[in-house]
């Protein structure tokens, strides 16, 4: 599974104007830059260190334009900021584009890499020996699972069901990349297409909670488009459509319940406030540099 090809294909479904050839050329350039800075005989961990420094430390290898966390849009709320082409152009990334680029380059360099997820977060997993290491791409370093458990408020149930922090199989990692496509389809109200993509992701990883939630959202959008926008009350729906309406209403709730049973919970205002405060502190720190 070629992570670069998959990410470019997904991004072009979101924005057909993405220049696949230009993205490929920039990935080639970055790959060559890492290779040129990597002495022979390094351990996998040391090779990953070179990859990270090539991205995040200013030098001739990145035209003195290091890649950085976008503190103005850290969550990638502006969907175009999650596109690989945007990240490569602006050098400002988020918790989707940054780990995906590390995984793409790591794969090209022959390192054992994949993606893993946390609540509203994606990280790169790297096999540096017998154990997997978390590469926190937004900070350009490494992080323990226990730190994510604390910082992201991951529940004991979520750890038990392994919906978070598990090193994903390559096809499952591509499903994580498809989360941005699902966001775009939901925003456009393309309920049937959203359902189709969610089903494809779930066929590969039945416990992908983002896809589970998006499947619930797809049922909600179908209800809005087919019934709630046309009929003032459920009793006004024609008898021949009542069974379909009931099925979709039930399925919407059932898929949300499935996510909760796996240990997912909606982000709390407290956690988001704490995270945004850390971003403000980082902005102040950068302003003092």
Ranges and model annotations:
Residues 1-289:
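A structural boundary/capping signal
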